[in-house]
């Protein structure tokens, strides 16, 4: 080999040895820099994780409490809204009986006075029902609605159009938006 080539090879060997020495030195210094984990830092990390978990549980609990409060408010509102349903259901048969009593012909003076008393009583009861959000449903000529009316029969009728109420057998009643009792009706064909 030529002298120049030998120098290049020798320089390369020196360079490789220098690189290896530097690499070993850097690795040695890196090992020295790697310190055992601080036990206090590990405890801090553990406590931080516990705090985060507890905060998450707190948020969930607060959301659950809020949902319960909203549900209770809705239920209370429904109780107030439909408060008179049980009483209305108990009173409606009396209203029906008073209406039937008014259909009887009054011939003498005493019967007429009794009929007037029954009319006043019925008017007072109907006003009390209306004041408490209870309305009647099922009038002749009204369109048949299966959510509010119960069709007992279908009849031929010249007075009303098809699918309208031709005859009311028993009035229905609605409290707010809830049907207490559907009207029993005959529907025109």
Swiss-Prot record:
Pfam families (UniProt xref): GrpE (PF01025)
Gene3D superfamilies reported in the protein's UniProt record: 3.90.20.20, Head domain of nucleotide exchange factor GrpE
Key words, A-Z: Chaperone, Cytoplasm, Stress response
Chain intervals for the UniProt region annotation (Disordered): 1-38
UniProt GO molecular function: adenyl-nucleotide exchange factor activity; protein homodimerization activity; protein-folding chaperone binding; unfolded protein binding
Primary location group: cytoplasm
Record flagged with keyword Cytoplasm: yes
Protein localization: Cytoplasm
GO cellular component assignments: cytoplasm
Compositionally biased intervals (Basic and acidic residues): 1-14
A biological-process GO annotation: protein folding
Domain of life: Bacteria
InterPro entries: GrpE, GrpE_coiled_coil, GrpE_head
Chain intervals with Acidic residues compositional bias: 17-35
Protein family: Belongs to the GrpE family.
Alphabetized PANTHER family for the sequence: GRPE PROTEIN, GRPE PROTEIN HOMOLOG, MITOCHONDRIAL
Function per UniProt: Participates actively in the response to hyperosmotic and heat shock by preventing the aggregation of stress-denatured proteins, in association with DnaK and GrpE. It is the nucleotide exchange factor for DnaK and may function as a thermosensor. Unfolded proteins bind initially to DnaJ; upon interaction with the DnaJ-bound protein, DnaK hydrolyzes its bound ATP, resulting in the formation of a stable complex. GrpE releases ADP from DnaK; ATP binding to DnaK triggers the release of the substrate protein, thus completing the reaction cycle.
Subunit structure: Homodimer.
Identification of the protein by name: Protein GrpE
Organism per entry: Leuconostoc mesenteroides subsp. mesenteroides (strain ATCC 8293 / DSM 20343 / BCRC 11652 / CCM 1803 / JCM 6124 / NCDO 523 / NBRC 100496 / NCIMB 8023 / NCTC 12954 / NRRL B-1118 / 37Y)
């Amino acid at each position: 080999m030529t002298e120049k080539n030998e120098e290049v090879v020798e320089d390369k060997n020196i360079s490789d040895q220098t690189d290896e020495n530097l690499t070993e030195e850097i690795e040695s210094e890196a090992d020295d820099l790697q310190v055992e984990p601080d036990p206090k830092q590990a405890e801090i990390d553990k406590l931080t994780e516990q705090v985060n978990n507890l905060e998450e549980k707190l948020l969930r609990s607060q959301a659950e409490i809020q949902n319960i409060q909203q549900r209770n408010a809705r239920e209370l509102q429904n109780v107030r809204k439909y408060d008179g349903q049980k009483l209305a259901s108990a009173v409606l048969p009396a209203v029906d009986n008073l209406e039937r009593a008014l259909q009887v012909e009054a011939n003498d003076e005493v019967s007429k006075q009794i009929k007037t008393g029954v009319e006043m009583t019925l008017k007072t009861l109907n006003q009390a029902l209306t004041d408490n959000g209870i309305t009647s449903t099922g009038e002749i000529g009204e369109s048949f609605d299966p959510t509010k009316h119960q069709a007992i029969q279908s009849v031929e009728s010249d007075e009303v159009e098809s699918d309208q109420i031709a005859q009311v057998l028993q009035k229905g009643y609605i409290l707010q938006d809830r049907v207490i009792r559907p009207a029993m009706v005959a529907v025109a064909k």
